[in-house]
From Swiss-Prot:
Belongs to the methyltransferase superfamily. RsmH family. Keywords: Cytoplasm, Methyltransferase, rRNA processing, S-adenosyl-L-methionine, Transferase. Its main location: cytoplasm. The keyword S-adenosyl-L-methionine applies. The gene is rsmH. This is Ribosomal RNA small subunit methyltransferase H. It is found in: Cytoplasm. Gene3D superfamilies: Putative methyltransferase TM0872, insert domain (1.10.150.170), Vaccinia Virus protein VP39 (3.40.50.150). Specifically methylates the N4 position of cytidine in position 1402 (C1402) of 16S rRNA. It is an enzyme of class 2 (transferase). It comes from Francisella tularensis subsp. novicida (strain U112). S-adenosyl-L-methionine binds at G30, G31, H32, D49, F74, D96, Q103. One of its GO terms (cellular component) is cytoplasm.
Amino acid sequence: MHYSVLLQESINDLNINPQGIYIDATFGRGGHSKAILNRLTTGRLIAFDKDLDAISYARENFQFSNFEIVHASFASIYDYCLQHSLLGKIDGIIMDLGVSSPQLDNAARGFSFTHNGPLDMRMDVSKGITASQALEELSVDDLSYIFKVYGEERFARKIALRIKDYIQQNGSISTTLELAELIRATIGKKEKKNPATRCFQALRIYVNNELKDLEALLENILAVIKSGGRIAAISFHSLEDRIVKQKFSALINPKQELNRITKMLPQDSSQIKLKWITKKSKANEDELNQNVRSRSAILRVVEKL
């Protein structure tokens, strides 16, 4: 079953205007979209998702006249709003940056290191390279960098060397458990977390261009939102949260130094201002008991002045 993490908190903090125009940047299975639609009267909602399964689900289950689903990355939200004369007219944006439960639980998608399936990991299976292809094409140095930066993996180079050696001997790594077992055999189990966790995260981020897409969205987000409009971001790992926090902070306090990861201070910072609505919120005990995956979720909400 799919749970939308921090659902009530994020929707409440968006302060929904029943006549407003809203964007769900990550439709998933529509938990946040449904909650927004329930609060709209003459307003409308535009949702984005790269996952064709999510698009199919939306078209089957969200047949509302004030709802539109767009098969695209949230990085294209600015371009969409530009093309549809919506720049500066959006009342709020919700982005739930986590991988959805249906994606994780469906072994055929290749995201899980506990269920065997093809090593794919693409959010949009209609294009791009699979995780298996990425492992074959990337050099040891590039693979090590991805594991270290995107996965914060201490043994990045050791794992990268083992993977490339394995591929040289066997031709490819084609399944999720094949990769997970190779990582476990390389570094052992040194903590409670599955030893493949960080590398799978890193590979998923790389295959789906996740951080660059997030940067692209945040780079132009204030041109999309109207004055008084709000942005709610739910992140699930430190890299995402760091980008969100530092971008928001830079727009609230433009004098702070450049973010070493994103380099994204606004060009004319004196003209751009936000205020915090929720600086940091985490799932409460009830939600943690319902959905263990919510334990790492962080909600941050800002308002454009």
